[in-house]
Structure formats: C-alpha cells, structure tokens
C-alpha cells in the first residue's frame, strides 16, 4: 500500500507531528536516559501515544546518531538535542580515517534498532522515523564554511564525502526498515543553501538511490527547512512519496500545483504558534491550517519543524486534538 492510499478515504486528515524532545517532559528523563535504554524509548513512545494520539508511533528523534557514532565531539544538553562541537574532516586523508558504522554493532545504533523493534511490536500504529540526510551529515563532518568553499575549489573531495555519508545513512536506514520502520523521513535542512542545479547533482541523485534501496514497502518522505520554492521541482523528483515543508511555505498555494499522488506535510509554526500562543489560539491556528487544505486528499497535518524543548504540553495537546477534527466539522 502506498502512503497516498493509506491516508485517503478517511473522514479527517492524518497527523505526523515533529515532537522533538517533548516526551522528556512527560517521563522526567534526560535525553540520554532515553537514548541509552530501548525500554525507556518504548516507555516514552507509549506515553506520547497516550497523550497526543498521532497516527504513527515514533521513537525519540536522534539526529546525532551518525556524528556521534563517527566520533565527533558533541555538546550534550540534558533536555535538548546534541550539537557538533568540531568538524574534523578537512581532507581526503581525514575522510579515509573514518569507517562506515555497522548498524548492528557500532555505538548506540544497536540500541536504536532494538528500540524500534519494541515500539513496532508494542504500539499498533505504523512506526515512523526521522533521520539526518547524507548532505546534511556531510556538512556536519566538514563544517559549513569549508564545505561551501570546497564545492568550488575541491569538488572531488566533496563527492567523496557525499559518497561516504550516503553509505552511512543508507546502511542505517535499511537496518531500521528491517527493525520495523514503515514511514521514514529523511531530513536535509542544510540543502536549502543550494541552487537547484547543485541540489540535483549533490542531493537529489543520491536520495533517489537511497529511497529506492529501502524497498517498495516503506513510505518515504523528505523534509527540508526554510524557503524551498526554487527547489520544489527537484524535491518532487527525489524518490519520496511526500514532502514535509517549513512554516514559511504557503501550503494553500503550493498544494494546488502539487501532484495528486504526492503527499504534502506541514506546517504549523512550532515557534510562534506552538511555543508562544495559548491553547485556544493554537487550536484556532490548527483549524485554520486544516481548512486551507480542505478538499485536498493528499495532505497530512504536521509541524513546520521540530517543536522546541520548552513547548508547553497543553499547546501540543491542543494542536493534536484539533488536528483530528473531521472534514464535516471543518
């Protein structure tokens, strides 16, 4: 069954929210309390399912799994995602010192796979997962400034880095599918810096191969932050079944030109709306978004990006409750 078939013929829009670390507020754990325990991953996933009742199950997001397994130094806040402190890959020699991780034996990857197996078998909803994309991982390894310079000055080096990161992400993604992942979203936030031509050559070509390697039974989505209007024609041809778009994008105009067999996801503002407004205002903004999508069966409700760690839980509840409003009541 395709993703478009799964979401069609419903009496309401389905939801795939970007909850980030919200589950920590529910369970009182630090981030690495959860990352290091498949059982706690399951506990958080079950609590999130009870509290917010999305249409997919999901583990705690783990955008740092690749850089951490590759040995990059990280800043590790207790209640927010880790961030890279150094970008060590400046030459081909630096790159050759790294090895593609084995998802079944290296770092925390085996713990994540076990957590996915638990969630897939204990929660009776399709298991969704968001992972960092190969281009964004490459920029993390090299550093944004050096990466952009090398695109012009040393393109062969950049190609080697991208080939490496594509294998890292691909091997892990395929392992997560075997563990039970049904819906996989590849996040390429850094790709927004590229021109359409460079996006096609550096991102789209590799994504098509990666998505294809996951097999036909997996629902595939691409997320890129920011204003991606100039990239949309190429994003639509990346091999994904759906595109997740940022809150700066006008979905009501974009969806009119969107292929009917492609899903568009988004794009409630996680900053201005979810963090700053009252529950009543969040509910109103959610309903406003749903009404703007009315009549389009290829839409799924989501946030424009991850919500912040300090997002009030009552606002998340308000958004998710409103997102389940039936078409006849919009």
Task: Please give the residue ranges for each predicted region.
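Active-site-flanking structural segment that lines cofactor/substrate pockets
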Residues: 23, 30-53, 57
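Active-site loop segments of alpha/beta catalytic cores
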Residues: 1-23, 29-32, 55, 79-81, ...
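Intrinsic-disorder/low-complexity, polar/charged segments
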Residues: 37-39, 91-94, 278
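Glycine-rich, N-terminal phosphate-binding loop and its surrounding beta-alpha-beta segment
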Residues: 45-74, 101
């Amino acid at each position: 069954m395709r993703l478009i078939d799964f979401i069609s013929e419903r009496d309401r829009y389905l939801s795939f929210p970007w909850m980030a670390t919200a589950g920590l507020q529910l369970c009182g754990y630090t981030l690495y309390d959860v990352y290091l325990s498949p059982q706690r991953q399951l506990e958080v996933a079950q609590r999130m399912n009870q509290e917010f009742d999305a249409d997919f199950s999901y583990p705690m997001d783990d955008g740092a799994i690749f850089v951490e397994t590759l040995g990059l130094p990280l800043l590790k806040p207790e209640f927010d995602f880790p961030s890279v402190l150094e970008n060590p890959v400046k030459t081909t020699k630096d790159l050759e010192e790294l090895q593609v991780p084995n998802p079944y034996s290296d770092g925390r990857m085996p713990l994540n796979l076990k957590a996915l197996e638990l969630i897939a078998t204990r929660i009776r909803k399709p298991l969704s997962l968001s992972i960092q994309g190969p281009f964004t991982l490459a920029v993390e390894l090299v550093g944004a400034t050096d990466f952009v310079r090398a695109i012009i000055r040393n393109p062969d080096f950049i190609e080697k880095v991208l080939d490496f990161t594509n294998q890292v992400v691909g091997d892990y993604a395929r392992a997560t599918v075997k563990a039970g992942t049904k819906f996989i979203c590849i996040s390429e936030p850094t790709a927004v810096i590229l021109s359409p031509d460079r996006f096609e050559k550096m991102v789209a070509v590799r994504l098509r191969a990666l998505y294809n390697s996951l097999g036909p039974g997996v629902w595939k989505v691409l997320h890129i932050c920011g204003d991606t209007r100039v990239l949309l024609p190429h994003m639509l041809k990346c091999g994904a079944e759906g595109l997740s778009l940022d809150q700066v994008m006008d979905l009501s105009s974009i969806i009119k030109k969107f292929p009917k067999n492609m899903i568009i996801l988004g794009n409630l503002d996680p900053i201005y709306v979810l963090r700053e407004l009252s529950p009543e205002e969040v509910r109103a903004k959610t309903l406003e978004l749903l009404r703007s999508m009315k009549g389009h069966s290829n839409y799924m409700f989501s946030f424009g990006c991850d919500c912040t760690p300090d997002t009030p839980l009552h606002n998340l509840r308000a958004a998710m409750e409103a997102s389940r409003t039936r078409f006849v009541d919009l």
